[in-house]
């Protein structure tokens, strides 16, 4: 085979020299078809041999210092590759669409790999947060900044607070699903109502397109997809009553500063549509 003869290592070395690849590479055809066969009569190869050879190629690339991501999430390559750009978690139209969706694959792979998925857009941010399909999209120069900002503050930031916690249980009651990460850490979503809630340490960090996520000691990111008046219960450690500094971030990288007042552990403020705010005390 190419691996045993040393040709694979030579080709990879040539590839790196000619392309200048560094840091990372995405392989589009490496992982999708697990049971690939080679019917070449001169050098036939079965599924196991083919799979093992591909894993050797991945080893060569890692030794060259490259972080590898794959296209399609498949079990045999989970771990050999740590990020996949496509996982099939369709709610309708898939091979199991007649059955009740259960987040079995996310619970098995959570903490081992990251992945994205083409989720049903009818469910907004709910499904991405519930199943952890939060980790990649294809953005180009034509991608609206507002879309990127929505994805970061509404999905990626809240999920980052759960990514390192183990998935412990899944529960369903009527149309509401809950994934439990700890005694006071969970995601709860009702897909039909496009309603969700993310709770970490007993504190709600995201709810129905509004994010109120602590990002450090006495610092919080606030973001509203549609704009809304908010009455926030401040996290533990914040002053019950006092001055709160609010930085309204702008597209040009600058900010506008406001001074707000907290009272009795709560803060009333107006969150503008699609405008990140950083609070500090």
Residue ranges, per PLM feature:
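Active-site-proximal substrate-binding groove within the catalytic cores of carbohydrate-active enzymes
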Residues: 2-22, 31-276
């Amino acid at each position: 085979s190419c691996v045993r003869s040393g040709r694979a290592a030579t080709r990879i070395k040539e590839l790196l020299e000619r392309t200048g690849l560094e840091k990372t590479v995405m392989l589009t055809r490496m992982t999708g078809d697990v049971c690939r066969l080679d019917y070449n009569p001169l050098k036939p190869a079965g599924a196991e041999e083919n799979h093992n050879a591909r894993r050797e190629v991945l080893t060569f690339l890692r030794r060259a210092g490259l972080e590898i991501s794959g296209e399609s999430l498949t079990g045999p390559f989970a771990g050999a590759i740590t990020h996949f750009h496509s996982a099939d978690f369709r709610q309708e139209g898939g091979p199991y669409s007649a059955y009740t969706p259960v987040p079995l694959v996310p619970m098995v792979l959570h903490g081992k790999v990251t992945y994205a998925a083409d989720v049903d857009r009818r469910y907004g941010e709910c499904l991405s947060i519930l199943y952890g399909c939060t980790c990649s999209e294809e953005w180009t120069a034509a991608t609206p900044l507002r879309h990127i900002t929505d994805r970061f503050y509404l999905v990626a930031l809240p999920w980052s607070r759960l990514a390192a916690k183990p998935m412990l249980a899944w529960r369903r009651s009527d149309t509401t699903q809950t994934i439990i990460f700890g005694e006071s850490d969970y995601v709860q979503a009702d897909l039909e109502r496009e309603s969700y809630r993310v709770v970490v340490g007993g504190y709600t960090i995201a709810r129905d397109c509004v994010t109120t996520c602590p990002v450090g000691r006495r610092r919080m990111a606030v973001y509203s997809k549609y704009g809304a008046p908010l009455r926030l219960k401040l996290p533990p450690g914040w002053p019950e009553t006092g001055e709160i500094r609010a930085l309204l971030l702008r597209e040009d990288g600058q900010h506008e500063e406001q001074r707000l007042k907290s009272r009795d552990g709560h803060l009333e403020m107006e969150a503008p549509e699609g405008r990140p705010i950083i609070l500090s005390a």
